[in-house]
């Protein structure tokens, strides 16, 4: 049972990370779609202004205006096609999110059902509750199991079935507590990962700044060395010229 819980915890953590990536991608696609819509509206407005200018400035060649309008129309069609592709990609991401959450709920349901395989009545009730939460947010998964247990215990039962459900109440509550604890551990792990990521980003930024400073120092040192070499070369040239002139003077003397 502990191995199953650990495996479910690892899978749930992976699913949460994948959901976060899909959420970020979906938000990015929404922003891009909004920007493209604004660009399309701006293009349409620009085309209308061009038409108005064409009516006002009739002395200008119509061929130039027609070519400009045709070019703008091509750009608008390209933007519309790109907008359509982005919308399709956004729908695919949303479908993937729904599929991932459905798989996650099924896995958590199988975990609870495995511990209740000897009680078909509880399984049927859990199945009914599972079918009612297809559109519930992922952060409400532990609330689903609490609602399921509450619904089972509050349902009208009689005789042996009622007593049997009351006898299994403590065991079901224990599993609900385990699932709630798993959710808390998942949230804690995500927070730790985010904190670690922030620390790594800060460390990378610090190293980049240090690297930039060292590069600047190296550049200054290199320039100073080159200038020093140039000065030495000029001094050597001047000294050679002076020696040559002195030698010539001595020879003439």
Curated annotation (Swiss-Prot):
One GO process term, biological-process aspect: response to wounding
Compartments where found: Cytoplasm
Cytoplasm among keywords: yes
Primary location class: cytoplasm
In-chain residues carrying the UniProt-annotated modification Phosphoserine: 141
Tissue: Expressed in bone marrow, spleen and thymus.
Skewed-composition ranges (Polar residues): 235-253
Signal peptide: none
CC annotations in GO: cytosol
Region named Disordered: 231-253
One Pfam assignment: SIKE
GO molecular function, one term: identical protein binding
Coiled coil: 5-104, 160-223
Residues flagged as site, Breakpoint for translocation to form FGFR1OP2-FGFR1: 132-133
Keywords, sorted A to Z: Chromosomal rearrangement, Coiled coil, Cytoplasm, Phosphoprotein
UniProt family annotation: Belongs to the SIKE family.
Function: May be involved in wound healing pathway.
Associated disease: A chromosomal aberration involving FGFR1OP2 may be a cause of stem cell myeloproliferative disorder (MPD). Insertion ins(12;8)(p11;p11p22) with FGFR1. MPD is characterized by myeloid hyperplasia, eosinophilia and T-cell or B-cell lymphoblastic lymphoma. In general it progresses to acute myeloid leukemia. The fusion protein FGFR1OP2-FGFR1 may exhibit constitutive kinase activity and be responsible for the transforming activity.
Protein name: FGFR1 oncogene partner 2
Species this protein is from: Homo sapiens (Human)
GN (gene name): FGFR1OP2
């Amino acid at each position: 049972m502990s191995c199953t819980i650990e495996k479910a915890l690892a899978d749930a953590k992976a699913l949460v990370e994948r959901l976060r990536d899909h959420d970020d991608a979906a938000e990015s696609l929404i922003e891009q779609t909004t920007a493209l819509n604004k660009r399309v509206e701006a293009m349409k407005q620009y085309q209308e202004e061009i038409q108005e200018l064409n009516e006002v400035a009739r002395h200008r060649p119509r061929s130039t205006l027609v070519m400009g309008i045709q070019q703008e129309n091509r750009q608008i069609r390209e933007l519309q096609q790109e907008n359509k592709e982005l919308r399709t990609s956004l729908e695919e991401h949303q479908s993937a999110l729904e599929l991932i959450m459905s798989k996650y709920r099924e896995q958590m349901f199988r975990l609870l059902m495995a511990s209740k395989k000897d009680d078909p009545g509880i399984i049927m009730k859990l199945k009914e509750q599972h079918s009612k939460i297809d559109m519930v947010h992922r952060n409400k998964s532990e609330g689903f199991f609490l609602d399921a247990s509450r619904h089972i215990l509050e349902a009208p039962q009689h005789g042996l079935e009622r007593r049997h459900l009351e006898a299994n109440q403590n065991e079901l509550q224990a599993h609900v507590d385990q699932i709630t604890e798993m959710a808390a551990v998942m949230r804690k792990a995500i927070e730790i990962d985010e904190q670690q990521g922030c620390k790594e980003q800060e460390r990378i930024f610090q190293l980049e700044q240090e690297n930039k400073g060292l590069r600047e120092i190296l550049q200054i040192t290199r320039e100073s060395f080159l200038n020093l070499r140039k000065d030495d070369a000029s001094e050597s040239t001047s000294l050679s010229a002076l020696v040559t002139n002195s030698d010539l003077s001595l020879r003439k003397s």
